[in-house]
């Protein structure tokens, strides 16, 4: 989608921009593919906060997305491109030859009226889903499975993609957008192309209210809290941390401290780690 700039009629609108929704062809979602979406404000079943800075936001309904793409050898026609408030990418409404409807993440270049298909014998074209072993080396892909049949988990956000680098027996090598190269089972599926709506990275919210609409609450610095609320808190006026290392609200080392387990089973599938900043090397 293109970017629409607003006039500076107020201070909040001075640098604000938004989508022009030029690619959106249908404004009302398909009722049969909706599900209720309960907002928990970051609380668990006991009412304890498990994720901070969550709460509020506009009411939404969940769009049921087909991440598995296991309806093989049945062509589907793209009937509409829709906006999904629950993700950064747009979604495409598919109608299969047998009348079944489903949503998929809309890849870049997918238009209304185009035909897509899934299965081992599907063509290598945008929107088709195949097992990784059937995709040529060098192809750009998205919505990549990590376990066969579980559904795509990697490269699903707006503008995201990965590249198939090579094949080794029952595994293939995939380079992710972070620069990480990892082995994935060749029987896992992926979709051809790049996720659409890559202009999402250019969006400027302009005011705090747009962040609140998304259900995000203010992120307060520890240095401006009291000592009983955060290890960085307290002191007269602005004070340094006063510790050998910055700490989380619960006293754990943070900012550069590696948190990934050395015993994680998936470590053996990472051929080359992702690119990191100088403070984490």
Swiss-Prot record:
Record-level GO cellular component terms: large ribosomal subunit
Keyword Ribonucleoprotein among record annotations: yes
GO BP annotation list: cytoplasmic translation
Bias (Basic residues) ranges: 254-281
Keyword vocabulary terms for this entry: Ribonucleoprotein, Ribosomal protein, RNA-binding, rRNA-binding
Taxonomic superkingdom: Bacteria
GO molecular function: rRNA binding; structural constituent of ribosome; transferase activity
Subunit structure: Part of the 50S ribosomal subunit. Forms a bridge to the 30S subunit in the 70S ribosome.
UniProt cross-references to PANTHER family, sorted A to Z: LARGE RIBOSOMAL SUBUNIT PROTEIN UL2M (PTHR13691:SF5), RIBOSOMAL PROTEIN L2 (PTHR13691)
UniProt protein name: Large ribosomal subunit protein uL2
Lineage, top ranks: Bacteria, Bacillati, Bacillota, Bacilli, Lactobacillales
């Amino acid at each position: 989608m293109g970017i629409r700039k607003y006039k500076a009629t107020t201070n909040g609108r001075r640098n604000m921009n938004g989508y022009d929704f030029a690619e959106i062809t249908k404004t009302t979602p398909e009722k049969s593919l909706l599900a209720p979406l309960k907002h928990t404000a970051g609380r668990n079943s006991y009412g304890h906060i498990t994720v901070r800075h969550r709460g509020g936001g506009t009411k939404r309904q969940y769009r049921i997305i087909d991440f598995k793409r296991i309806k093989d050898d049945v062509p589907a026609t793209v009937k509409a491109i829709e906006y999904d408030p629950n993700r950064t990418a747009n979604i495409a409404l598919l109608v299969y030859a047998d009348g079944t409807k489903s949503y998929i993440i809309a890849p870049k270049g997918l238009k209304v009226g185009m035909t897509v298909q899934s299965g081992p014998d599907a063509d290598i074209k945008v929107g088709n889903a195949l097992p990784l072993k059937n995709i040529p080396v060098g192809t750009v892909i998205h919505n990549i499975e990590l376990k066969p049949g579980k559904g795509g988990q990697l490269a699903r956000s707006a503008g995201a993609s990965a590249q198939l680098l090579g094949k080794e027996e029952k595994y293939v090598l995939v380079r992710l957008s972070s620069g990480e190269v990892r082995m994935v089972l060749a029987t896992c599926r992926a979709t051809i192309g790049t996720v659409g709506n890559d202009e999402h990275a250019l969006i400027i919210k302009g005011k705090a209210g747009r962040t609140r609409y998304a259900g995000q609450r203010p992120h307060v610095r520890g240095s401006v809290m009291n000592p009983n609320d955060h290890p960085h808190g307290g002191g007269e006026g602005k004070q340094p941390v006063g510790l050998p290392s910055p700490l989380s609200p619960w006293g754990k080392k943070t900012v550069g401290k590696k948190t990934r387990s050395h015993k994680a089973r998936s470590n053996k599938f990472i051929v080359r780690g992702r690119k990191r900043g100088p403070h984490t090397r």
